[in-house]
Amino acid sequence: MNEPTALSELPPVTAWLSDMDGVLVKENRALPGANEFLAALRANNIPFLVLTNNSVFTNRDLSARLANSGLDIPEENIWTSANATAAFLQQQSPGSTAYVIGEAGLTTAIHAAGYVMTETDPEFVVLGEVRSYDFRALTQAIRFIEGGAKFIATNPDVSGPSDEGTLPACGAIAAMITAATGKQPYFVGKQNPVMIRAGLNKIGAHSERAAMVGDRMDTDVRAGVEAGLRTHLVLSGSTAREDVCNYPFRPFGIHEGIGDLIELVEAAH
């Protein structure tokens, strides 16, 4: 197998995208090196985004939650699957209509994209994370899709963690709708590189000079690889070093935690 291109032959990284959970925070606590990594980005005037597939919270909510964890990340530096989904819809069919199942993070983003949320003949059915599942809403979504509405979902994650244990996530509910309609959704969030490319567009960055940091091979690293970024896997989240060989792609670098990347940030300037 060919070795990755030598670091000295690559252009410097001038923009960074980082996953949130398992990279910067874990169980509402900042991970070691997270503050120092963010400080290095700011000190070197490097544009960055913090990414999450969670579509429940608005960017303002997430910024406040991160502040409670000890991290200062303004809402304009946050890019959620809800933001990416709204940007995708705005690009595909500007000013159209959608039947939306989701929380404030998704509905706020859809409104900001100029969409009308409706229960009358929508062009799209858009599914995000929800805290409680409404049988009537799911039934309505199924009937709209059967009637020709296009099925969009924020992210393919089938489960997520909570203080009480595992919770069903967007992908699990999407599977139920698919079982009833025979229609597969188009997932916008990671592992789809669309979310990465839209984030790069937001900060005016190019893939060949950007890096993606994540703790999961199947979403973060895969999306980064497919979008053409240099990917860095950190072992502070859900992936162990021995898991990497189970995938047909590999990250540019593997690190114990986000603090190990500070040197790379500073070396670019």
Where are these regions (language model features)?
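Asp-based, Mg2+/Mn2+-dependent phosphohydrolase catalytic module
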Residues: M1-I46, S55-W79, A86-H269
